[in-house]
Amino acid sequence: DAPRISGMHFGPDGRIYSCQGGSFGRIVAFDLKAGEMEVIAENVRPNDLVVTSDGHVYFTETAKMQISHIPPGGSVQAADVASKTDGPQRPNGIALTPDQGTLAVSDYGGRHTWVWRIGKNGGLDLRQSYITLRTPSPDLPSKGDGMTTDGVGRYYVTSAVGLQMFDPTGRMGGVIAAPTNKPIVSVTFAGPGHQYIYVAAGDEIFRRRTKASGVEAVRPQSKSK
């Protein structure tokens, strides 16, 4: 039993990497076959995470206005920290583009989703506000939360007005209303052909078949015999 899990992503080693928030404040990895959990990082305040195909872990620390990075075999480092006038004020959801060259982060307390280019060593640069989210009214934040991308690079961001969709250039493609009066907070593609989009709202999970296909989870690296 592992309480306060908020973000989950398969790593190249086949384990599920997760944020464990609250008083735990750590990043953990679950080996489902062995039934074991390893603590990857402690004394952090994680919200959501992604893992690249070569083992870099990126996670949002909302309270710190920070994107953090754990390189393979390394320790936690601040990849980017926003100021009160620039960057995501409450970084929340996080996703990779299909080529894993760009990292995107939603801002629960603002109107934008921000992007960074990922360098060869895993560092982040060229931060920019790439997507403008719709809000319930001009004076309210978007409450941008969980997010994902599909196989052609479209962005899907949960928000106060529903699931917002954007093309790879950041242009609005449409909004799917929330299936319940509870806010939707997480989104991912799964199922046959990764053509079903799933959202979490409160204690319920909903799915909808789409014409798009999500990005397949990282495949475990094969071991040489």
What does each model-identified segment do?
Residues 24-27, 65-67, 111-114, 163-164, ...:
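Structural signal for beta-propeller blades
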Residues 95, 101-112, 116, 120:
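Glycine- and Gly-Pro-enriched alpha-helical subdomains that act as flexible
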Residues 186-225:
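Blade-level signature of beta-propeller repeat domains, shared across WD40, Kelch, NHL, RCC1
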Residues 30-35, 71-75, 117-122, 167-171, ...:
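Short loop/turn segments that connect beta-strands within beta-propeller blades
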Residues 1-20, 24-26, 41-59, 64-66, ...:
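Beta-rich, blade/repeat-based domains predominating
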Residues 1, 35-41, 76-85, 126-138, ...:
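A short beta-strand motif characteristic of beta-propeller blades
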Residues 110-112, 116-118, 127, 131-171:
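Loop/turn-rich, solvent-exposed surfaces of beta-rich toroidal or solenoidal domains
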